[in-house]
Amino acid sequence: EDVIRDIMNEKGITGFENLPINLSICTVDTLTTDECIFTTKEENLENEHIHYITGAPLETAVRASMSFPAIYTTCPYDKYNFIDGGSKDNLPVKILRDMGVGKVLAIGFDIMTYNPDAGLGGLIKVIWRALDVYSIDGTRESKKMADLAIDIKNENTQLFSMDSVDETIQEGYDAIMAHKDEILKVFGEQNSAE
């Protein structure tokens, strides 16, 4: 959380309350297995197995959303013990719809493409693929609920490889630019800029 807080300080951000937009950050509580959504403002929503949390430190919410199982430790806060929200809902379109968001652009990595390998690399890939299996049906449904869904192809990128960060960013940019006309058609041109 200290690193996140330092970045926030550099940007002049003290918390949710002074962000230029409403922000929702998804995570999962390991104690209840419920989804938990950190929000900028009180949403007054009641959904079974979803907790809406306001008033939490922004750095805690960001840290909680990064708590990828077996890579980072969980993030304890209040009565919760958080892990990455993608563990349960890898494309939280329904959450946004429930919160009244008008149009939703769903952007995610292409998890439908899978090429098994032999050896240790293949073992690691199959472990990650097993995790995909748990959320893939939800991801499919989320794509249907979005106004537009875009897959980022990144088959050459290794999960958690810092050497691949620039390549992954470029692949994301390329995916968006390849769909630019469609995005502008669905969401309007009021904020178009390259």
Walk through the language-model features, giving the residues of each.
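Patatin-like phospholipase
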Residues: 1-194
